[in-house]
């Protein structure tokens, strides 16, 4: 079985990735300090993957998540991590007070590189939802405020979330690509 180094320090993301593509590749984990750049979701994902491939010297998988509020024309987008750290769940929810739309799009972009010097390949998944007051456990990013069909990600079981999430949709594309590449 082929091995891929998933570059993350987030144990929850690692568990989700292993649960979804672990039957196709051996997902190992490494933590690499990657510079935070500004740009589009795709530019950020590619640069992060290039940097990780150079640091590891082999095949890597990186992931970047964005949460865009429709009322704010896609913000906070790829900067959601910093907005969450600064404002918390309730603060993110309050950002939409005064707007008609509480709609949001969760975007997950996986980037794969076979190694240094190779152009990263992107796999993207998107899920539409709404921003709500926090519900459910607050142990995984913005899951408590992103509602999909009546439940926040935080209220769902891991199995339920892994069937509909933006991360799942991106990983299915990656999984299919890996199956095609490895056969």
UniProtKB/Swiss-Prot annotation:
Source species of the chain: Emericella nidulans (strain FGSC A4 / ATCC 38163 / CBS 112.46 / NRRL 194 / M139)
Protein name as annotated: Inosine triphosphate pyrophosphatase
Swiss-Prot/TrEMBL cofactor(s): Mg(2+); Mn(2+)
Gene Ontology, cellular component aspect: cytoplasm; nucleus
Classification of source organism: Eukaryota, Fungi, Dikarya, Ascomycota, Pezizomycotina
Subunit architecture: Homodimer.
Keyword tags: Cytoplasm, Hydrolase, Magnesium, Manganese, Metal-binding, Nucleotide metabolism, Nucleotide-binding, Nucleus
Compartments in which it is found: Cytoplasm; Nucleus
EC supergroup of this enzyme: hydrolase
